[in-house]
Amino acid sequence: IKNRNKKNFIKIFEGAGGLLVPIENKKTTLDLVKDLDIPLVIVVGNYLGSLSHTLSIIKNIENYNLDLINIILNQNQDDSLNINDTEILLKQSLGKKILVRKILKNSNYKSKEFSSILSDIIKYFNL
C-alpha cells in the first residue's frame, strides 16, 4: 500500500464510532488509518460538546502525522444548536489550515455542500 499511486488508488473507508474505537489488541481505528497511510475526512455532529470532541481528535490526528482533507459538520434532525455558530467557532479555532464544510439536514447529494466536499477530495488527490 505504501508504494501506491494516489491517482489510481482511491478507496473509501468508514470508521464508524470514532477514531479512538478499539479494534484489536490495544489498536484503534486511528492506528489502522496510520498503518494504511490514508487521508481522513472527519464527520462531526452539531451538539453540545462537539467542538471539544472535534478539536481533541484533530490533536490526535496531528500527533499521528496524518493528512486531514476536511471536516464535515453534520446537522442533526433534532438540532437545538445553531450550526452556523458551531461552524464559525470551528473555523476560528482551526484557522485556515483545515477546511470545514457543513451539511444541512435537508441536503442531498446534488447540493452545493456535497459538491464542495467532493471538490476538496478531488483537489487533495490532484485528479
Where are each of the predicted segments found?
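Structural motif
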Residues: 12-14, 41-43, 72
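Anionic group-transfer/hydrolysis microenvironments
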Residues: 16-17, 47, 76
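Charged helix-capping and loop-helix junction motifs
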Residues: 24-31, 55-58, 83-88
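Class I SAM-dependent methyltransferase SAM-binding "motif I" and its flanking Rossmann-like core
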Residues: 50
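C-terminal lobe/tail of nucleotide-utilizing enzymes
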Residues: 59-127
